[in-house]
Structure formats: C-alpha cells, structure tokens
Design a protein with these regions (language model features):
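Internal hydrophobic alpha-helix adjacent to the cofactor/substrate pocket in enzyme cavities
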Residues: 416-421, 506-521
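Core beta-strand elements of the Rossmann-like FAD/NAD(P) dinucleotide-binding domain
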Residues: 2-5, 246-256, 260
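A glycine-rich dinucleotide-binding beta-alpha-beta segment and adjacent secondary-structure elements
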Residues: 184-187, 191, 223, 228-233, ...
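Helix-rich C-terminal "cap"/substrate-channel and partner-interaction subdomain
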Residues: 139, 363-440
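A conserved FAD-binding loop/helix module that cradles the flavin
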Residues: 492-511
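Mid-to-C-terminal "cap/lid" subdomains and adjacent gly/pro-rich loops that border
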Residues: 36, 48, 60-68, 255-261, ...
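N-terminal glycine-rich phosphate/pyrophosphate-binding loop and immediately adjacent elements
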Residues: 2-122, 133-134, 278-298, 304-312, ...
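Conserved redox-cofactor binding core of oxidoreductases
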Residues: 108, 116, 122-229, 427-428, ...
Length: 536
C-alpha cells in the first residue's frame, strides 16, 4: 500500500525547501529531491565533514552529464539551451542544481530584492494586483531573519570593491551595498564560484536552515528520488510517482502536491504529466539574465583575489542623462578567483594546495560581473524531463545579441572599464576601447556559449488561465490540489537575483497552505511575526 501524506513537495531548493520548513509542523509532509542530501549538523564557520568533503572534492564531472544518454551530473541537471539565431544547431549547457538545498546550496549568496519597476511589471504582464512590495514585505523580513541576511562590515570588503565604490561615486554613479545570506563566513574567497557548495556551512541555504527545521517537525525527506509523474485523477492531483534506488514508487497526497523543481524542472514535470495539454502556457514566457564578466589587471600584487567576499556592491550602468539601464554590475565579482571551469583547464581538482596555488598566481586581477536583467526576448521550455529543449534566442540572426541586451552590455563594459582605469588598471577584457563591432561580437559569443542565469516565469502566476499557469498563490488553474512554488511562477522578469524573491513567495505560499489547505488558522503568519517583533 502506498504511503500517504497531507502534502508532497517535489524539490528541496529555495522554493520547496523554504515552504517545507514553514508547514511541516502543521501536517504530514513528504519532501522529494532528485539529488543527494549532504548530511551533517550545520556548523557555520566550520562545516560538517560530509559537506566539507563535497565542497572540496568537486570536479568538472559534477557539471557534465555522466554519459551521452544522460542529462545529469552528480549535483546538476544539464539541459541544452539554444540561444543563437545565427547558428540554430549550436547549444550551450544550462545547468540546474540537483541537490537538497537546490540553487540556494550553490549560489554566490548575494541577496537582492526586486525594484519598484519589477513589481509594476508583474501587474502589467499578468494582471496580478497583490504581488506588491507592501504585500511581500513581511515575507522578505521572515526569510531574511531565517537566513541571517546582512551587509558586511567594510573591514571585510575586498580591496577592489572599496576603491571601485569610491571612484564610481566620484563619477556620479549610485552604488548599493549588496546584502548576503551568510553566517560566520571566514572569507575564503570561494563564494565567487557559483556552483560550489560552501565548505564551511556559512552559506545559509535551505539545506542548512529550513530542511532541518522541517525534519525536526516530522517531515520525511527522500533524496535521490526523481519524480516521473504527477498522479492526476478526475482533474485532481492525488500524488506523485518517483524513482529511487532502482524502484518505482507512488506516494499519495491527501491535500496538496507541490512542484518546486525550478523554472526548468517544474514545467518539464508538468509536461511529462500532461498539464501542458490543458494549459499551453506551461513552459512559455521564459525570462533569464544573460551576463558577461570583465577582468582587469591592476598594478601590485596585494588585491587578494583568493580571499574575501567579492559581491560587496552593485550598481546599474548609467546613461549620459543619469538614467539607470537594466544592466546590473556586481563588483568586484568578475572571475578573480579560479572557477571550476578554469581549474579544469589547469587539470587540477577544486581542492587542496594545487587549487589555491592557481588562485594565487593571479594576484593583480580584479573584475566585475554584468547581468542584463530585462532582455527584449522571451524563451520557452519544451520536450520532456529526459529530453528537454530550452529556447532562449537572445542572439540575433546576424551573430550579435538582440539590440537592447547588447546596447546595455556595451554601455556597462565601457563604464566599468573607465572606473577600473581610474583605479590604475592597465588592461581589461573585454575592453571598452575596442572597436564597437569587435566588442559586440566578443560579448555575443560569450553569452551564447555560456548560457543565461536565473530562469524565471515558465509557469507564471496571473489572474487569467489564458495567460498564466497558476493563480496568485501558485495554485494551478487546471489541476485541483496542485501548486507550483519556485522561480517558475514569477510573473515577469526581475532586476535582481531571484533567490530572495523565491524565498519570499514561498513564505507567502506557506501562510496560504497553513491556513487554507491544512486548516491551521492559529499559526502565526509572517505579518503576525513582524508585528510581534515590533511590540517586543
């Protein structure tokens, strides 16, 4: 007889993991994740032996598929993403985390909230009127308390960030300090390596925070469990079928099935389950953030690129009229630390003295990373879980990125280059002084061969099933008792890393599930928690 739970959550990342921590005390919850659960009690600043081993013995095989017939590495799914209209047969590898904690377990830890223009854009795109800064404020505050979100004392800032801020401000460019969700960070310099788990448990992922909370409350977590189908009977989600340890198992859900497999995985699971036949919006409206690094060489060898936390500050590239563009610059977060793919070129592992020695060879490097937050392009996710196709054609028919994206990126590269020149940089790549056709081609090649980060919107929330997949709370228009809770439901593209918004929308979903699905009406909402703190 199949096991039965009140709620089944498919995916233990930023969305599903956060949701689980908030609802597990109020009903029986099964959490399924396709990746491993790296065990050990959280020890911020030290790390559990299991997570230390995982973080220090990762190699390129973690990112690449195990074989030609698989889209899985050890900790990641890898999907083909087609980005270049001028070369329709070429694809890049889009990697999505496959580990308990999901993207929150391997991201850089930068915590940015959406801007006002984003909230306005949600309503413009799908008509939602309650996706507002005010409505989400308590949920951001709840998440920020749980994840220890803060800004670093300037004594811990990377040297390049200190000088970058000073010079940018002198040029009239508004600079913002970047918050992050870390605790007891030892500033090892590895947080730049997006895709690397934190060796020292300092990155406050859901694997460190909400998943342990859910397990303590009685939830069941099954790792290495790949969901293959949502069980739907008479238009009602009644459970899921998953594969684990060579067995195929069906688990029943009395009240709710939650898809939280990310903006790529969730629409694929809905497609595998036939939901796209009921709602053609499934997998459509893909938004993402293509980006480029800029690296510079500076005089001296005391820039300490192998230490510190590089995501200290950010700003928008500014026009001559002082207007912000949609290109966001993170400084000094170029590639001044050796990333996994660079380390692979040196044929070393991502651990031990050989790895650190490579990082320390480049003592005069600094840089920034530039994201284009609102490209004038919309993509889609099609195919199946085992044979997915992602189309995000930001590359135009003549080998150059679409106009808005390339114009914003060229402006940003030139502006960042000028700042670094004033810091003393004697070379940069890409170089804003290069002829514009050369610069545009360089950046276009980089973007269309490296992918686009932060996918969003593939099961977007709205007020009309003709233009959306779920309602404002994430509940499916077409299948009763089915919820989506991850970046896929974001109604329109945002001007920030999505991690903060995903956790805030998951907090909001948790209040809804506790109250409306589980009937726990005496449980404090996020707003209740904030009001209680105010009166203490």
């Amino acid at each position: 007889m199949a096991d039965t739970y009140d709620v089944i959550i498919c995916g233990a990342g930023s969305g599903g993991g956060f949701l689980a921590g908030e609802i597990a005390a109020n009903g029986s919850v099964l959490i399924l994740d396709a990746g491993p659960h790296i065990m050990g009690d959280p020890k911020p600043g030290v790390g559990s032996p299991e997570r230390r081993k995982t973080a220090t013995q990762v190699n390129l095989g973690t990112w690449l598929p195990a074989n030609r017939d698989s889209n899985r590495g050890d900790l990641f799914f890898t999907y083909p993403m087609y980005m270049d209209q001028s070369n329709p047969f070429a694809s890049t590898a889009q990697r999505e985390a496959k580990v308990v904690g999901g993207g929150s377990f391997v991201n850089v830890g930068a915590w940015l909230r959406p801007r006002r223009v984003d909230w306005d854009g949600f309503q413009e795109a799908t008509g939602v009127t309650d996706w507002t800064k005010r409505a989400f404020e308590a949920h951001f505050l709840r998440a920020e308390r749980i994840l220890n979100v803060h800004r670093d004392s300037r004594e811990y800032w990377n040297k390049a960030s200190v000088l970058y801020e000073r010079i940018a401000l002198s040029m009239g460019i508004p600079i913002f300090e970047t918050a992050s969700n870390r605790q007891a960070c030892i500033f090892c310099g590895h947080r730049l390596n997006a895709g690397m788990p934190c060796k020292y448990d300092a990155l406050m992922s859901t694997a460190i925070t909400q998943i342990p909370k859910a397990l303590k409350a009685g939830a069941t977590l099954l790792d290495n469990a790949s969901v293959v189908n949502i069980e739907i009977t008479n238009g009602i989600a009644t459970g899921v079928t998953y594969e684990r340890n060579g067995q195929t198992v069906t688990a029943n859900a009395r009240k709710l099935v939650v898809m939280a497999a990310g903006a790529i995985g969730t629409p694929l699971l809905l497609r595998d389950s036939g939901v796209h036949l009921k709602n053609p919006n499934v997998g459509q409206h893909l938004k993402a953030h293509p980006g480029v690094p800029i690296d510079v060489l500076l005089p001296g060898d005391d820039w300490g690129s192998d230490r510190g936390y590089q995501w200290n500050i950010h700003h928008h590239a500014m026009t001559e009229n002082g207007e912000p563009t949609d290109a966001v610059v993170h400084a000094s977060a170029g590639f001044p630390a050796t990333t996994p793919w660079v380390a692979a070129a040196f044929k070393i592992g991502l651990f031990g003295r050989p790895y650190k020695d490579v990082m320390r060879q480049f003592k005069s490097r600094a840089g920034a990373f530039i994201f284009e937050m609102k490209p004038n392009v919309t993509g889609r996710v099609t195919g199946t879980r085992k044979n997915a196709v992602i189309s995000y054609l930001v590359g135009g028919p003549y080998g150059v990125l679409e106009d808005k994206t390339i114009d914003d990126l060229v402006l940003a590269v030139r502006q960042v280059g000028e700042i670094y020149k004033k810091m003393g940089a004697y070379t940069a790549f890409p170089n804003g002084d290069d002829p514009e056709p050369v610069l545009k081609q360089q950046m276009s090649l980089f973007v269309t061969t490296s992918g686009a980060l932060h996918p969003q919107g593939t099961c977007r929330a709205g007020v009309d099933p003709k233009t959306s997949v779920v309602d404002t709370w994430g509940m499916s228009w077409d299948v009763k008792n089915l919820m989506c809770c991850d970046a896929s439901i974001i109604p329109n593209h945002i001007s920030s890393n999505p991690n903060a918004l995903i956790m805030a929308l998951s907090s909001r979903a948790a209040d809804y599930v506790n109250r409306e699905i589980l009937g726990a009406r005496n449980v404090r909402t996020a707003a209740d928690e904030i009001e209680s703190e105010v009166h203490q």
